[in-house]
């Protein structure tokens, strides 16, 4: 039997999000909010459970793809709605059971561990709210907790209380098993509230303790405004940690960094940069208004206003303004401006001229372009894939390359220029 099990309640409909998408799947810094909570749970125990209902199969598959050992349960919402109803069919097999909500991504592991300490029968997380509206009130008399009343069921006097339920509990599991069958749905919503467990426990002379936690860490995400507030908080935490560990950021408040991104060595991010997905940035400079997605960048400078799309590997390279790469593997090259390099491999010493395009799509499928070492590509060149350019090749500006080019060659593909003397005056005279 494990010492602690964690149960994450994620069965709610999330109607205030005003979306068909399940609330716990809304992303914060690149990952679903439920993932943020699951990571914290696994820092406490390997015995982690999630209760779902709405969009069950979809959420289940998404969770198991990242956390394959999570035990997933489906709430019988028709017969047992509410937070206590969510626990009806769970296999409770630990000494203590920590119960947390799936919409509290800001919760800290240290506070959850504090909630699990001690020998009391029930530990309840509370905070003193400046504005308690919407929270369940923790009703007490002379410091003794009497009960928890939901906002919609509280009377006028109870609504004046500002000690509120933060939404996390730690039960001795044997106590939880005793209390769950005793919880009734005698309230305005006809739901089974886990908060009623406190009142039942006190009637049984069990020991209940309020554990004060930080309000900002237990903020529930109930609408998209709260979602934006939570993402701002997580962004600030990510950037503060990175800057303290050596990443230089200019105007950090304008920068977006995915929670999965990694930075190695001495890196620099300029204003309005977005780092999206599982990027790895090593000893590189990302200049103003550039976007990097799911790519690995080493010893390079990118931008300003460059777009590095997914699955790029860039090393010892200069990528300039208005250059877009996608599924590109490039090493020790220069692409200064206004180019699209997709589905390609470019080797060291190559210079990509302004306006170069790898034409990688024929309307049915994608094709790759291979470019060797020390290739000079003139401006306004189109490389129609599939095509291979071998080493030491010069491609004349304005060329459309449709055939492979052998090593050491000049490739030129354009109409011969013809000048017609006196044409300007003749042409405009006819117009008049």
Swiss-Prot record:
Required cofactor names: Mg(2+)
N-acetyltransferase: region residues: 246-432
Active-site residues, as the UniProt record annotates them: 337
Record has Magnesium as a keyword: yes
EC number(s) stated in the UniProt entry for this protein: 2.7.7.23, 2.3.1.157
Intracellular or extracellular location(s): Cytoplasm
Residues the entry annotates as binding Mg(2+): 103, 222
Pathway(s) the chain acts in: Nucleotide-sugar biosynthesis; UDP-N-acetyl-alpha-D-glucosamine biosynthesis; N-acetyl-alpha-D-glucosamine 1-phosphate from alpha-D-glucosamine 6-phosphate (route II): step 2/2; Nucleotide-sugar biosynthesis; UDP-N-acetyl-alpha-D-glucosamine biosynthesis; UDP-N-acetyl-alpha-D-glucosamine from N-acetyl-alpha-D-glucosamine 1-phosphate: step 1/1; Bacterial outer membrane biogenesis; LPS lipid A biosynthesis
Reaction equations catalysed: alpha-D-glucosamine 1-phosphate + acetyl-CoA = N-acetyl-alpha-D-glucosamine 1-phosphate + CoA + H(+); N-acetyl-alpha-D-glucosamine 1-phosphate + UTP + H(+) = UDP-N-acetyl-alpha-D-glucosamine + diphosphate
InterPro entries reported in the protein's UniProt record: Bifunctional_GlmU, GlmU-like, GlmU_C_LbH, Hexapep, MobA-like_NTP_Trfase, Nucleotide-diphossugar_trans, Trimer_LpxA-like_sf
Gene Ontology CC entries for this record: cytoplasm; membrane
Cofactor annotation comment: Binds 1 Mg(2+) ion per subunit.
Binding of UDP-N-acetyl-alpha-D-glucosamine, residues: 9-12, 23, 82-83, 136, 150, 165, 222, 309, 326, 340, 351
Region annotated Linker, chain positions: 225-245
Superkingdom, natural source: Bacteria
Region Pyrophosphorylase, annotated ranges: 1-224
Assembly mode: Homotrimer.
Record's function text: Catalyzes the last two sequential reactions in the de novo biosynthetic pathway for UDP-N-acetylglucosamine (UDP-GlcNAc). The C-terminal domain catalyzes the transfer of acetyl group from acetyl coenzyme A to glucosamine-1-phosphate (GlcN-1-P) to produce N-acetylglucosamine-1-phosphate (GlcNAc-1-P), which is converted into UDP-GlcNAc by the transfer of uridine 5-monophosphate (from uridine 5-triphosphate), a reaction catalyzed by the N-terminal domain.
The protein's name: Bifunctional protein GlmU
Protein's organism: Campylobacter hominis (strain ATCC BAA-381 / DSM 21671 / CCUG 45161 / LMG 19568 / NCTC 13146 / CH001A)
Gene: glmU
């Amino acid at each position: 039997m494990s010492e602690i099990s964690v149960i994450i309640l994620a069965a709610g409909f999330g109607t205030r999000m005003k979306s068909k998408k399940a609330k716990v799947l809304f992303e914060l810094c690149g990952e679903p909010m439920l993932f943020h909570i699951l990571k914290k749970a696994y820092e406490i125990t390997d015995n982690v459970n999630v209760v779902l209902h709405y969009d069950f199969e979809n959420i289940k598959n998404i969770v198991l793809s990242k956390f394959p050992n999570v035990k997933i349960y489906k709430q019988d919402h028709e017969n047992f709605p509410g937070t206590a109803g969510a626990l009806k069919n769970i296999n409770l097999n630990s000494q203590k059971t920590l119960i947390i909500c799936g919409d509290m991504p800001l919760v800290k592991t240290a506070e959850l561990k504090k909630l699990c300490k001690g020998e009391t029968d029930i530990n309840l997380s509370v905070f003193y709210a400046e504005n308690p509206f919407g929270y369940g009130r923790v009703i007490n008399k002379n410091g003794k907790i009497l009960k928890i009343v939901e906002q919609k069921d509280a009377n006028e006097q109870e609504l004046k209380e500002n000690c509120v339920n933060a939404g996390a509990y730690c039960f001795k599991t044997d106590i939880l098993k005793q209390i769950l069958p005793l919880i009734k749905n005698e309230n305005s919503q006809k739901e089974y509230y886990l908060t009623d467990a406190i009142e039942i426990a006190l009637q049984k002379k069990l020991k209940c303790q309020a554990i004060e936690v930080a309000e900002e860490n237990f903020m529930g995400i109930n609408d998209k405004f709260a979602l934006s507030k939570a993402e701002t908080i997580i962004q600030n935490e990510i950037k503060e940690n990175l800057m303290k560990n050596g990443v230089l950021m200019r105007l950090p408040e304008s920068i977006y960094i995915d929670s999965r991104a990694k930075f190695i060595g001495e890196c620099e991010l300029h204003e309005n940069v977005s780092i999206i997905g599982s990027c790895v940035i090593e000893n590189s400079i990302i200049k103003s208004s550039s976007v990097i997605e799911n790519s690995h960048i080493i010893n390079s400078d990118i931008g300003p206003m460059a777009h590095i799309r997914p699955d790029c590997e860039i090393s010892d390279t200069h990528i300039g303004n208005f250059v877009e790469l996608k599924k590109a593997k490039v090493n020790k090259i220069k692409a200064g401006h206004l180019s699209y390099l997709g589905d390609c491999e470019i080797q060291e010493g190559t210079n990509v001229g302004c306006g170069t395009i790898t034409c990688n799509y024929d309307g049915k499928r994608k094709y790759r372009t291979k470019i060797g070492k020390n290739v000079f590509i003139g401006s306004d060149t189109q490389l129609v894939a599939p095509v291979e350019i071998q080493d030491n090749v010069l491609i004349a500006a304005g060329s459309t390359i449709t055939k492979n080019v052998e090593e050491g060659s000049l490739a030129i593909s354009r109409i011969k220029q013809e000048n017609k003397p006196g044409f300007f005056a003749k042409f405009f005279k006819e117009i008049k």
